[in-house]
From Swiss-Prot:
Source species of the chain: Shewanella frigidimarina (strain NCIMB 400)
Record bears the keyword Secreted: no
EC number: 1.17.7.3
Lineage, broadest ranks: Bacteria, Pseudomonadati, Pseudomonadota, Gammaproteobacteria, Alteromonadales
UniProt name for this protein: 4-hydroxy-3-methylbut-2-en-1-yl diphosphate synthase (flavodoxin)
Family listed: Belongs to the IspG family.
Amino acid sequence: MYNESPIIRRPSTRIYVGNVPIGDGAPIAVQSMTNTKTTDVAATVAQIRALEKVGADIVRVSVPTMDDAEAFKIIKQSVNVPLVADIHFDYRIALKVAEYGADCLRINPGNIGNEERIRSVVECARDKNIPIRIGVNGGSLEKDLMDKYREPTPEALFESAMRHVDILDRLNFDQFKVSVKASDVFLAVASYRLLAKQIRQPLHLGITEAGGMRAGSVKSAVGLGMLLAEGIGDTLRISLAADPVEEIKVGFDILKSLRIRSRGINFIACPSCSRQEFDVISTVNELERRLEDITTAMDVSIIGCVVNGPGEALVSDIGLTGGHAKSGYYDDGVRQKERFDNNKIIDGLEAKIRAKASMMANRIAITDKTE
C-alpha cells in the first residue's frame, strides 16, 4: 500500500508543552483555542474536554485579565490536556499563570512591552521549566515596523520574530517555539519560509483569522499544506470562526491528506453519479457521524459502482463497491464472499468497520509491547 509520506521534515530542536513533545521529529501536534469567557470556568472546562475528546494535543486559553488568571488556575486543575496561556499587553499575567501551572506561555511581540518585561517572563518560564511561544501576528506588528514597511510584509513579520528570538538567545533561553501568522496565505507562507531558513526552533503554523468553516478550512488547507509539504511545521492550529472542535477535525484532515499523521477513519468516497447503485452521499455522511469515536487510523473506501470501486478497495482496509441490489465488500483489499443489501449497507458496514478498527488497535498494542 502506498501510504508512506515522502515529506522530509525540517530539522528542529525539541521542547515539551506539558507531556507533548514538539519538534525534532515528534508528531505534529494539533491544537485549538477556547472561545468561551475564561472566567466562565464551567463552560471553558466543558469546551476543553470536548476538544480533548476529538484528539486535541494542546489547548490555548486566552487570559486577558487577572480575574481570568484566577479562573485559569481552576481550569488547569480540571483538565488533562496541556494548556497554553495566551497573554497580550500585561506581562504580569504571564507571571501569574506560570505560577498556576500553565504548560506554555504565548506572548505577542507587538504588545507585550520592552525587553525588561520579556526578561521577567523568560526568567519565570525558566524557573517553572515551561516553554514560550513567540507569537507574531500580521495584525498587531510593532509600530516602528509598520512605519518602516508601511504594511505587514514577510520581512516585517520575520523581523518582529527575530527581535524576540535574539532576546531569548541573549538570555540563554532555548525552550521556545515561534509563529508568524497572517490572514493572507502568501504572506504567512513567505514569512514562515524566511523563519525556517534562519532558526532551528520548532514552528507553530497557522493562517490567522482564516474565516468561517468552509472558506477558513480551504484557506488553511492551502497555506498549511504548502508549508507542511516542504517539511515546515511542528504544531498547528486551524483558526476558524466556528466551533473549536471543528478546528481539530480539520487539522487532522490536513495532516491525514499529506500522510503526515493519521487519526480515525480516512473515508475515500466518490462524489456519485447516475451509475451509483446506492446513495453514496447519505451513506458516507451517516457513517462519518456514527464512527467519529474511532481513533484507529484506517482507510475505508465507499464507491458507488464498479468503475473505480475495486481499485480503491484494493488499497483500503475496508472497501465497498456498489453492485446491482447488493454491493461487494472487501477486507484488506480482498473481496469477500459476503455482500451487503444496498438498503442495509450502513448498519452492516458500521459493524465491519468497528470490528476491523478493534482488531487493528489490538495489533498495534501488541506490537508496541514487544518493541
